[in-house]
Amino acid sequence: MTNTYTSLVKQTFHFPQEDFDLNDDGYLEFNGLDIKALIDKYGTPLKLSYLPKIGMQINRAKKMFETAFKKHKYEGSYNYCYCTKSSHFSFVVEEALKNNIHLETSYAYDIEIINQLYKRKKINKDIFIVCNGFKQRSYTSRIARLINTGFTNVVPILDNKDELQMYKRSVKHPFKLGIRVAAEEEPTFPFYTSRLGIRPKDILEFYVDEIEGYENKFQLKMLHIFLNKGIKDDIYYWSELNKIINLYCQLKKICPELDSINIGGGFPIKHSLGFEYDYQFMINEIVGNIKKACKKAKVPMPNIFTEFGSFTVGESMAHIYSVVGEKIQNDRERWYMIDSSFITTLPDTWGIGERFLMLPINKWENEYQRVVLGGMTCDSHDYYDSEEHINEVFLPKIENENNSSDSTAKTEPLYVGFFHTGAYQDQISGYGGIKHCLIPSPKHVIVDYDKNGKLTDWMYAREQSAQSMLKILGYL
């Protein structure tokens, strides 16, 4: 049979791949994990976190920057920061910290996480804490408290001109500062300029008026930029990056303390088996552009900071569902109903049209057909109908299996996996709490190596109970 799902994948992509393969029984493996065994043990719907992938991604980026620094004989240092907002879970942050990284925060409560990490001896007071975001007093006061208690590398990134006054009043020791440069948005965005940061044309004057001359109290150490579009090889990205590089060169001539550029994050992750992105090329170009501009301006090369969130944690997670029903609504539309909801578990699919890498776990030798995946809520937008590489979804057929002589085919549902879902989905959906149509949060399983180097799995959170929801709603 040539029209099986296996043949479709192998004709469309290079398969198997490093992180996806079929085992001898025909079931999909994810980073070598036997997903079917985990389904048999825990059931579906299931959220799966594979923690070793986090360290692999961090060290991959570090190695590529090291290669670029050697290629260009770059004289600064590289500092990898993890954005806690991508996934705040302790098991994620602590896994990332095992790889000698720094942290980026975005809200007041992030600072409470920093305090807990210090109490657990997961960090010391020399770690860089890059504090982003528009800051209310609850945030600035916590930042000040960190600095006042001896955290020497806390860098509040000024989002507006008034923010500095808050630190002047509350910080008792000399401290470092950064400035976020307001980037121009890409042409298709609803706004011309980012709401975050200070306008580039105002920064030199702001430095002279408010920072210069106070170096014994605070020093401007970092320029920061982040582009919503991410790090892409196009005119828009290089134009915005060169603006901050040129601004650094101008400021450096009057601000000798300035020594770092933070280019933010934005590395894409794999959302299709056909994903192609030359990370090393982009890093080489970024490093080369910074060096070239600094040489031309005759200023020292800055240290380079990055803030990778999705790149760090995104590829470490998967959501696994069962197809619990099939509905044919007309001659062209065939629905596979899953045992959960896209709106409540993968909100980016609904909110911004995000596409994740989707593959069936089983039935790869069945014929395939075009389908639409439907969630369990009553909302008409709870569906998934296209992939990253094509505006359709193809999955193995499940019809006529009752006529099969294979007893497994009769009883085993089709399992569908959405992969590389580790960034932002729980943060946007909320963990527990009240969900649309009271759809419960799925169980969450973690896979990691134990102290003896053996791969183990355990349940971090059970499926949400009705009682937990009723209590929040005031019925219990």
At which residue positions do the language-model features occur?
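N-terminal capping/small domains of soluble enzymes
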Residues: M1-S138, R370-V372, N391-Q427, G432, ...
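Conserved, mostly hydrophobic/aromatic
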Residues: I54, K85, Y107, I179, ...
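A structural motif corresponding to the C-terminal end of an alpha-helix
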Residues: A68-E75, F206-L220, Q250-E257, E285-P302, ...
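Active-site-proximal beta-alpha core segment in soluble small-molecule metabolic enzymes
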Residues: Y78-S260, I269
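Glycine-rich beta-strand-to-loop/alpha-helix junction loops that act as flexible
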Residues: L227-N228, I261-H271, T306-F311
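Short glycine/threonine-rich loop-to-helix capping motif typified by GTGT followed
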Residues: K232-S239, K270-M282, V313-G325, G430
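Catalytic cores of soluble, metal-dependent hydrolases
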Residues: W238-I261, S272-N303, I328
